[in-house]
C-alpha cells in the first residue's frame, strides 16, 4: 500500500495571519506578507520562500504558501505551488479563472523557478507579482533555479489561446533579498537534487 500524500501548512501560519479575511490594499502590503511568511519559514526549518494568492481588486487573501520541501519531504512543495494548491482547495476548483471567481494573483517573495513557472501556467491566475529575481536567488542562496526561457515574461503575458498572465517585478526586492541572504548566513539547506 502506498502512503497518502498530503501537504499541510504549518501551524505557525495562523500566528502570521491571525485574520484570514484581511484585505491587503497594495502590492507592497501583499509582498510584505509573502516576505514575512518566508522569514518565519526559515525560523521553522523551511526554505526561504513565501507566497500568497490574493483577489486582485479587493486585496482579499485567498491562500498563503510557504516552502515545505524539507519538512514535508516533497520536492514539489515550493511556496508558489503550495499557495496555488491551497487556493484551488479554498475555491474548490483546479482553474482559478473559473467563471464566478474574481481575478486572482500570485505574490511571491522570489521569482518562480522552472517548476513553479509550469504550475503558474496552468493555474488560472491573472497576475504574478515578484520580489527577488532569479539571479538574486542563485547568488544569495546558492540554489540552481533551472532554465527558464529568456522571454519568460512575454510568454506569460501573451499565450494564445490561453489568457495572459500579467507580471509585476521587483516589488520590495531589497527586503526579499535580505531574507534570501539571511537563509544562507544561517546555514540553510540547499535542497536541490544532489545538494
Regions found by a protein language model. Name each.
Residues 97-111:
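Immediate flanking context of iron-sulfur cluster ligation sites
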Residues 63-65:
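Short hydrophobic alpha-helix segments
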Residues 73, 107-127:
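Local cysteine-cluster metal-coordination motifs and their immediate loop/turn environment
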Residues 68-82:
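A short, polar/charged loop-to-alpha-helix boundary motif
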Residues 42-46:
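Short loop/turn motifs at secondary-structure junctions and domain boundaries
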Amino acid at each position: 500500500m502506498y502512503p497518502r500524500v498530503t501537504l499541510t501548512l504549518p501551524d505557525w501560519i495562523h500566528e502570521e495571519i491571525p485574520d484570514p479575511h484581511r484585505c491587503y490594499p497594495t502590492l507592497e502590503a501583499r509582498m510584505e506578507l509573502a516576505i514575512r511568511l518566508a522569514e518565519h519559514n526559515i525560523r521553522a526549518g523551511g526554505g526561504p520562500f513565501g507566497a500568497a494568492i490574493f483577489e486582485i481588486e479587493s486585496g482579499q487573501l485567498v491562500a498563503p504558501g510557504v516552502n515545505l520541501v524539507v519538512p514535508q519531504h516533497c520536492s514539489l512543495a515550493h511556496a508558489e505551488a503550495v499557495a496555488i494548491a491551497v487556493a484551488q482547495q479554498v475555491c474548490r476548483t483546479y482553474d482559478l479563472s473559473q467563471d464566478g471567481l474574481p481575478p486572482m494573483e500570485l505574490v511571491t517573495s522570489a521569482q518562480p523557478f522552472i517548476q513553479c513557472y509550469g504550475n503558474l501556467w496552468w493555474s488560472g491566475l491573472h497576475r504574478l507579482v515578484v520580489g527577488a529575481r532569479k539571479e538574486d536567488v542563485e547568488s544569495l542562496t546558492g540554489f540552481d533555479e533551472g532554465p527558464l526561457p529568456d522571454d519568460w515574461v512575454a510568454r506569460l503575458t501573451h499565450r494564445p489561446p490561453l489568457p495572459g498572465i500579467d507580471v509585476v517585478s521587483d516589488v520590495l526586492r531589497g527586503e526579499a533579498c535580505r531574507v534570501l541572504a539571511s537563509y544562507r548566513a544561517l546555514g540553510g539547506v540547499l535542497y536541490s537534487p544532489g545538494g
